Amino acid sequence: MLQRGLSYGEGPFVIWEDIDMRTVCKPGHPVPYSLHDMRVSDITLSDGQLTLQFETGLVRIAEPCVQVDGRVVLTGVESCEVWRLSPNGEYGSFSGKKQTWEKFSRKHPEFSFEVTDELYGFNQVRYEGYLSLPDREKLTEFCMAVYYTGDLIYETEE
């Protein structure tokens, strides 16, 4: 049985050390806003800066959890790739496509993307959800993976 001893940590992790010489790391939420269920209306990538615009803003994680107008900016972007997978997230076999953001956006200048999951790691972020294209009735499971060496910035109206 784990007996918690010393607890410490800043930022996205809280770490406990116990008397059995084990270290348990519990990831925390590293960001102040949630993008869950938010619809991305525009994405631009220029000069190493990726900007995501949202139809209805972002949700502040701290109480009170309110929705605020804002956008997400990543600086120092070195790569941005997207995966298009199964229609409506169906199980079973599927065919997909992996592309750079530049190639995808040239072919699909009009789209919307509803974020259902956000994953954050060292110099990387991944947004997953459903892509809507004007010429397709069904939503498509979609993933955007970004590797960056700069900052993750939330520009909000508050």
Where are the language model's segments positioned?
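Generic early N-terminus positional signal peaking at residue ~5-7
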Residues: L6-S7, K26
